[in-house]
Amino acid sequence: MTRRNNGHSARFLVASASWFSHHSGMIREPSRDRPGRSPAVAPSFQHERALLKRGVWPVAGCDEVGRGPLAGPVVAAAVVLDPKRIPKGIDDSKRLTAARREELFEEITATASFAVAFASTARIDRDNILRASLWALARAVHALPDMPRHVFVDGRDRIEIACACEPVIGGDGIVLSIAAASIVAKVTRDRLMCKLAQDCPGYGFETHKGYGVPAHLEALGRLGPSPHHRSFFAPVVAARERHRAPPIGESASATETSAGISIEATI
């Protein structure tokens, strides 16, 4: 799906194929790798600007959210910020309140080119969480309206894309376009989990977003797995065995796809 926002294009995709990771050199954030680190510094546009000065553009940032939860998809986002219209206050999504993330989401999607891709629970079960996440990241990059010439991706893994890829450990706290992608991915996934909560009430997806908090574990043990749970994550395996339920399989994909399309229409 492609949408226009103030002259910029946005695309949303549902992930449906596996991808492999590659390891290579990367930017590293010293403050996150050593004890006694200094206070967090806000991400900057200096890495993108350095490439722009060399004539390398578009430059995208890419991040994902949802590797750790017991339920719901992984959501990846790729963002190309407009150097002349960068929203103020962009930061690692984890440092922001939910309300501030929502505000910045609207500003980013109104001024930047971006794309979002979903890796369903069925894909996660089939390919494993790492491969599904890397596939969604690559899918988001390839879905951008214009293929970037350089991509900064959060983490240590390269992704299979048709342009230069630079992993950045702790990138959502260093590279501004990665931070923007982290906000887009987080808000998109949170909204999706609220939709899935309507489809499967009782688990509290709207509050914990699928993460393994005590209330979620209690509901999982009491109700058994829903079609949105990841079959091979340990607490889900235990609940499935307790309820003698088969692996969830492909049934989650259609529901997530439907919910994703609904969310795309409202964002």
Curated annotation (Swiss-Prot):
Task: Enumerate the subcellular locations listed in this protein's record, separating them with semicolons.
Answer: Cytoplasm
UniProt-annotated binding residues for a divalent metal cation: D63, E64, D154
Tell me the domain of life.
Bacteria
List the coiled-coil residues.
Answer: none
Name one process (GO BP) from the record.
DNA replication, removal of RNA primer
Q: Which SUPFAM superfamilies match?
A: Ribonuclease H-like
Please provide the record's keywords in A-Z order.
Cytoplasm, Endonuclease, Hydrolase, Manganese, Metal-binding, Nuclease
Say yes or no: keyword Cell wall biogenesis/degradation present. no
Q: Which GO terms describe its cellular component?
A: cytoplasm; ribonuclease H2 complex
Group of enzyme by EC: hydrolase
In terms of Pfam families, this protein maps to:
RNase_HII
Q: How is the cofactor bound?
A: Manganese or magnesium. Binds 1 divalent metal ion per monomer in the absence of substrate. May bind a second metal ion after substrate binding.
Quote one Gene Ontology molecular function term: RNA-DNA hybrid ribonuclease activity
Reactions catalysed, as given in the entry:
Endonucleolytic cleavage to 5'-phosphomonoester
UniProt-listed Enzyme Commission number(s): 3.1.26.4
InterPro entries associated with the record: RNase_HII, RNase_HII/HIII, RNase_HII/HIII_dom, RNaseH-like_sf, RNaseH_sf
Cofactor(s) in the UniProt record: Mn(2+); Mg(2+)
Enumerate the spans annotated as RNase H type-2 domain. 57-245
> What is stated as this protein's family in its record?
Belongs to the RNase HII family.
The family database entries (NCBIfam families) matched by this protein are listed as: PRK00015.1-3
Report the protein's function: Endonuclease that specifically degrades the RNA of RNA-DNA hybrids.
Q: What is this protein called?
A: Ribonuclease HII
